[in-house]
Amino acid sequence: MSDTPYYTDQVLRAAACYWEEKDADNVKLEKAELQARIEAYILANNTCALATGTGDYVRCTPIEYSYHDGCFWMFSEGGKKFVGLAKNPQVCLAIYDTYEGFGKLHGLQVMGRAELVEPFSERYNAHAAFQKIPLSALQKLS
């Protein structure tokens, strides 16, 4: 075994750029077509892995979502994801298919800023109505 670590900064930078370089010569979809395909994929699913974190603490939580008005919406009664959300609104979520072989996996990663909506506010209640979730059911989670 070598005294020199394999994972040098150069090796890690090359790994981080792998897909950009591999896909550089591929034909790209028009922006409107790409957006339509992305939204269709998002709407065809309802569960994601939501990553939150702060400092050395990270958490990745499977959670149900809905998508409308260009935003992901999630209801949660609590959990460790709020440790990160309390100090850092930056999040990442991943939606993906069951693995059926190399080159056949479909998925999507989204990075953005989480916004906590106050329970039973007008926006909260509107989303509950959109999801057809009775407020009485959500009150039991509080």
Regions of interest found by a model, annotated:
Residues 1-30, 105-142:
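Charged, gly/pro-rich active-site loop segments
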Residues 26-47:
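Short, basic/aromatic recognition patches
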Residues 77, 87-98, 106-115:
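Active-site-adjacent structural patch at catalytic or cofactor/ligand-binding sites
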Residues 80-83, 100:
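Short, surface-exposed beta-strand-loop junctions and turns on beta-sheet-rich folds
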